[in-house]
Amino acid sequence: MSEKNSKDVILIGAGVLSTTFGTLLKELAPDWNIKLFERLDKPAIESSNERHNAGTGHAALCELNYTVEQKDGSIDVEKAKEINEQFEISKQFWSHLVKSKQIQNPQAFIRPLPHISFVQGDKNVNFLKRRFEALSPLSMFKGIEYTEDHEKLKVWMPLMMEGRDPNETVAASKIDEGTDVNFGELTRKMAKNLSEHDNAELFYRHEVQDFSRRKDGKWEVKIKDLKTKKVEHHITDYLFIGAGGAAIPLLQKTGIPESKHLGGFPITGEFLVCNNPEVVAKHEVKAYGKEPEGTPPMTVPH
């Protein structure tokens, strides 16, 4: 094995995590050498693909699980503030990439879209109203609106109100400054930008199989070229595992203490696509509901 294969950083997976981290390294440490390995034949095919996630610009504008009701009935907004700040930083980073001409055509991956929280029943309506009152004074949630009026709700979200019982107890809050994000397109743009970096190489159809830690602290990574069936060994100072569902098994192969006592569980979901323009035109919002009591947050209808 030759030391000529030695690189500073190896990124595993070509989804939004690895391409984002690689892009950050390109900006902050342009002299570092980067190798990205992806098992499939192009970036953003699995979890980052636009058909495999909700495409929400997560800023805690409509996601109710970030504002938790306390035992005394108050609403804790600290997590919502944290999430909102993090998403603002993401938008600033993407803006920098556009302004520096590293990625083009931003409207292909992000666009403005009102975010709505919608609830049903007296208990949930009471919660949403208190959430609205807790968020309203905060500048990051400026412009949030609240209503229980069916006629106003028909203006906000006509498709969701169509055929609904006019006596049903419902409520919604709305913020117009929400966003819809095509994480698949964003990932593809960052992968292309990274591939044009002098010190970066992207390898598709390459499967990372194992790791071993050398005495000098570096990592030896066993990688199989799925096209040629050849097994390669690469030496690197740092590893970044952004491999979606394969991340935990790969992390466990490193043997590091942080890999212990971790687990995952499968989540199944279904995204329905409407190709009827007349129906689509009635729903120009991102709407999130509230999960049924006693169920995990990923059961939120949206």
What are these regions, as identified by a protein language model?
Residues L17, K42, A246:
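Conserved Rossmann-like nucleotide-cofactor binding loop
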Residues A281-H302:
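FAD cofactor-binding and catalytic pocket of flavoenzymes
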Residues K7-K35:
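N-terminal Rossmann-like FAD-binding beta1-loop-alpha1 element of flavoenzymes
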Residues V170-Y238, A243:
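Helical element adjacent to the flavin cofactor pocket in flavoenzyme catalytic cores
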Residues A59-L61, P257-K286:
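Central beta-strand plus flanking loop segment that forms part of the substrate or channel wall
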Residues I241-I256:
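Flavin (primarily FAD) binding-site architecture
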Residues K26-E50:
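Glycine-rich FAD pyrophosphate-binding loop
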Residues G55-V155:
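Dinucleotide-binding Rossmann-like beta1-alpha1 core, especially the glycine-rich loop
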